Regions:
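Pyridoxal 5′-phosphate
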Residues: 1-386
């Protein structure tokens, strides 16, 4: 059976050029980047090159890039570090109801253990947060606002420029989890007034276990761990040289291909959306119809259980998701889908389909042809069991 991978929001295949670049590091560069002899300096040069590649992709200075173990660590460093840096001055955090658990769970932990005031702003039924709602939630004690650029489940894009302008006017640090969007869409910190941005290599055909946090010059972020003082003391620990090289190469490739790939994937996305809505009764598109990631088609299919649909599609050769891969084993409906105002029973039928570089027209045709049969089977099984 030929497999069709349609879960690129969960992770992407490592680009062969990325894998080869990493293999060369493992094979030829044994040094520690902190060492002053030749082997160490060779490793340091590779880390510096990757830092330049990441910075160039988002319009930043290399000195503003901090390497991490991934998006979750970047989110934690942003929230915990920014709030700790302003402890005693301001203690408020504002975020939205559809953030990734790396933000929401961190915010809850800070509220419980660090006496942070935690405010959650609701989103509209299409997943967009009104900038006016963020403005209304900010008060004199607000230290940090965290709003993701693109939602990992429904693909909705947020108006970061407007929100950032509000934060800047109010003297509030602004963080955005851009894990899903950087690499797929243009993201330029020279035009978006954002202070902290989280990135993750494996979302744009790089390796798992490495990411970065953009820290705008002048933004205060306290370190969350102690040790050797790497990354200018912000993220101490010996650098993952091969992973960082992979991140840099993946970012360069994504930037080079972004324009044509985004347009191609958006066309495939729209074919999936139109096909599913036309052929699957009681299917509802989730997220904004146009302000969404170019590769994301997400739905609620009433009368189904998302996990059952995913497993049935798996048997037919398709890899899709019923939501975030980080919570796919959870039997509770997605907090993101519930935040859209969709009732709990319907929310159990969420389905996320995300295309990628390797997705073809034939793949999309096959998926659209298969899904209605799978949904009928799942609904029939559920009716018999009821």
């Amino acid at each position: 059976m030929t497999r069709v991978y349609l879960d690129h929001a969960a992770t992407t295949p490592v680009d062969p050029e990325v894998a080869e670049a990493m293999a060369r590091v493992y094979r030829d560069v044994p040094g520690n980047p902190s060492s002053i002899y030749a082997e160490g300096q060779a490793a340091r040069a590779l880390v510096d090159t990757a830092r330049e590649q990441v910075a160039a992709a988002i319009g930043a200075s290399p000195s503003e890039i901090v390497f991490t173990s991934g998006g979750t660590e970047a989110d934690n460093l942003a929230l915990r570090g920014a709030l700790k840096a302003r402890r005693g001055e301001r203690d408020g955090l504002v975020t939205t109801s559809i953030e990734h658990h790396a933000v929401l769970d961190t915010a809850r932990d800070l509220a419980e253990h660090a006496h942070v005031r935690f405010t959650v702003v609701d989103v509209a039924p299409d997943g967009r947060v009104p900038p006016s709602a963020i403005a209304a939630a900010i008060d004199d004690r607000t230290s940090l606002v965290s709003v993701m650029h693109a939602n990992n489940e429904i693909g909705t894009l947020q108006p970061l420029a407007e929100i950032g302008a509000i934060c800047r006017d109010r003297g509030v640090t602004f963080h955005s989890d851009a894990v899903q969007s950087v690499g797929a869409l243009e993201f330029d910190v020279r035009r978006i007034p954002v202070d902290l941005v989280s990135l993750n290599a494996h979302k744009f055909y790089g390796p798992k276990g490495v990411g970065a946090l953009y820290v705008r010059k002048g933004t205060r972020v306290a370190t969350m761990q102690t040790g050797g003082g790497q990354e200018k003391g912000r993220r101490t620990g010996t650098e993952n040289v091969a992973g960082i090289v992979g991140l840099g190469v993946a970012m360069r490739i994504a930037t080079e291909r972004r324009g044509r790939e985004s347009a191609r994937q958006a066309a495939l996305r729209d074919r999936i959306i139109d096909g599913v809505l036309a052929r699957v009764p009681d299917a509802i598109l989730t997220g904004h119809r146009t302000e969404r990631l170019p590769n994301n088609a997400s739905f609620v299919i009433r009368g189904t259980d998302g996990a059952s649909v995913v497993m049935a599609l798996d048997l037919e050769g398709f890899a899709v998701s019923s939501g975030s891969a980080c919570t796919s084993g959870d039997t509770e409906p997605s907090h993101v889908i519930l935040a859209l105002g969709i009732d709990r029973e319907a929310a159990k039928g969420s389905l996320r389909v995300t295309v990628g570089r390797g997705t073809t027209d034939a793949d999309v045709d096959a998926f659209i042809a298969t899904l209605p049969k799978v949904v009928d089977h799942v609904r029939g099984t559920a009716a018999v069991s009821a």
